Every structure is written in structure tokens, then in C-alpha cells.
């Protein structure tokens, strides 16, 4: 718990500073896309994660890899922010900073993140219907769906928005029926 507080003390100010820079330069969406791309890279490449986290790797090598990963189209301000993290030895917090920045961008644009778990893969129409339903329930401008599958649900979906969970799965219905039957005895 103490470690999370210490990480938050580093992550939040840097993410806030990046958001301020993004707003001042009217590049919030571009920076958010850059952060999402980096988060995706952290998920897909253990090699990249290890490289960035390794304190023995020289700063110039890290800058070169970051520049190569971001490509020619990345905004100069964003790239300079990454270089600042390298110079201040805060690059190990990059993943957390990107996660916090994306959360700030969602809040700024009134976008809700919904974790959707279904028994089977959802069709595009089903995803759109869930997004519309979540939008109605939350009053958000838009909804981002984080979709996963879990065959143990048997059927239906479980939707988590913030701390609220909406269980419309067959497994959840069976559990509620079981609790009702056990409770009536």
C-alpha cells in the first residue's frame, strides 16, 4: 500500500504536467493516442518493458529506443517529455504516467471506461448496444469498452463501470437463485 502511494506521488504530478502541456498546445487527443500506443507496447513486449525499467541502460540508449518506437510522426513536445523522464530517471514510471494521463483525458472529455466480460465474443451491434446502455446509465459523452471473454459466465455479460458492477450473466442469475433458495429455508 505504501509503495502505491509513493508511485502515485510521482505518477500524478507528471501526468498532470503532461495534461497541462497537452491542453496548452491543443494536443490532448494526440498525446492520449501516444500514451495508448505506449501502453499497448508495454502489454505486448516484455523486452520493451525490461529495457525501459533497467537502470543499467544508458539514458542516450533509452532516448534512441523511445524515438525509434514513437517514430517520425510523434509530437516534439511529447517526445521531449519522454526525454525529460529519462533525464530525471523517472522513465520507470512511464506506464503509470500514461495510464493516469489517459484517465485524465477520459475525465476531461466525460468518457467512461466500461470493463465488459462476456461468455462469448460480442458482435459489433452488441458492443454498440452495451455502449449506448452504459452511456444512458452514466450520462457520459462517450464510452470506451474494454472487452474480455470468460466461458465460466455460461451466457450473458458482466459490466463494470468504476466501482459499480452490473451482472447480467447466467452464472450470476444462477447464483442469485441459489442464494434466494438457501435464504428461504
Curated annotation (Swiss-Prot):
InterPro entries: ATP_synth_OSCP/delta_N_sf (IPR026015), ATPase_OSCP/d_CS (IPR020781), ATPase_OSCP/dsu (IPR000711). One of its GO terms (cellular component) is proton-transporting ATP synthase complex. It is found in: Cellular thylakoid membrane. It is a peripheral membrane protein. One of its GO terms (molecular function) is proton-transporting ATP synthase activity, rotational mechanism. Gene3D superfamilies: N-terminal domain of the delta subunit of the F1F0-ATP synthase. Keywords: ATP synthesis, CF(1), Hydrogen ion transport, Ion transport, Membrane, Thylakoid, Transport. PANTHER family: ATP SYNTHASE DELTA CHAIN (PTHR11910). Belongs to the ATPase delta chain family. F-type ATPases have 2 components, F(1) - the catalytic core - and F(0) - the membrane proton channel. F(1) has five subunits: alpha(3), beta(3), gamma(1), delta(1), epsilon(1). CF(0) has four main subunits: a(1), b(1), b'(1) and c(10-14). The alpha and beta chains form an alternating ring which encloses part of the gamma chain. F(1) is attached to F(0) by a central stalk formed by the gamma and epsilon chains, while a peripheral stalk is formed by the delta, b and b' chains. F(1)F(0) ATP synthase produces ATP from ADP in the presence of a proton or sodium gradient. F-type ATPases consist of two structural domains, F(1) containing the extramembraneous catalytic core and F(0) containing the membrane proton channel, linked together by a central stalk and a peripheral stalk. During catalysis, ATP synthesis in the catalytic domain of F(1) is coupled via a rotary mechanism of the central stalk subunits to proton translocation. This is ATP synthase subunit delta. It comes from Picosynechococcus sp. (strain ATCC 27264 / PCC 7002 / PR-6). The lineage of its organism: Bacteria, Bacillati, Cyanobacteriota, Cyanophyceae, Oscillatoriophycideae.
Amino acid at each position: 500500500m505504501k509503495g502505491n502511494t509513493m508511485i502515485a506521488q510521482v505518477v500524478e504530478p507528471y501526468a498532470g504536467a503532461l495534461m497541462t502541456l497537452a491542453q496548452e498546445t491543443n494536443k490532448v487527443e494526440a498525446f492520449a493516442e501516444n500514451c495508448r500506443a505506449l501502453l499497448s507496447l508495454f502489454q505486448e513486449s516484455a523486452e520493451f518493458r525490461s529495457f525501459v525499467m533497467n537502470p543499467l541502460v544508458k539514458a542516450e540508449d533509452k532516448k534512441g529506443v523511445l524515438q525509434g518506437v514513437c517514430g517520425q510522426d510523434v509530437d516534439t513536445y511529447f517526445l521531449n517529455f519522454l526525454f525529460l523522464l529519462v533525464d530525471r530517471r523517472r522513465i520507470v514510471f512511464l506506464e503509470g504516467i500514461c495510464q493516469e494521463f489517459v484517465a485524465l483525458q477520459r475525465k476531461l472529455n466525460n468518457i467512461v471506461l466500461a470493463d465488459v466480460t462476456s461468455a462469448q465474443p460480442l458482435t459489433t451491434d452488441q458492443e454498440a448496444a452495451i455502449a449506448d446502455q452504459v452511456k444512458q446509465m452514466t450520462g457520459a459523452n462517450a464510452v470506451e469498452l474494454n472487452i474480455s471473454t470468460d466461458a465460466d459466465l455460461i451466457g450473458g455479460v458482466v459490466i463494470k463501470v468504476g466501482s459499480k458492477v452490473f451482472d447480467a450473466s447466467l452464472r450470476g442469475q444462477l447464483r442469485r437463485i441459489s442464494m434466494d433458495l438457501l435464504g428461504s429455508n
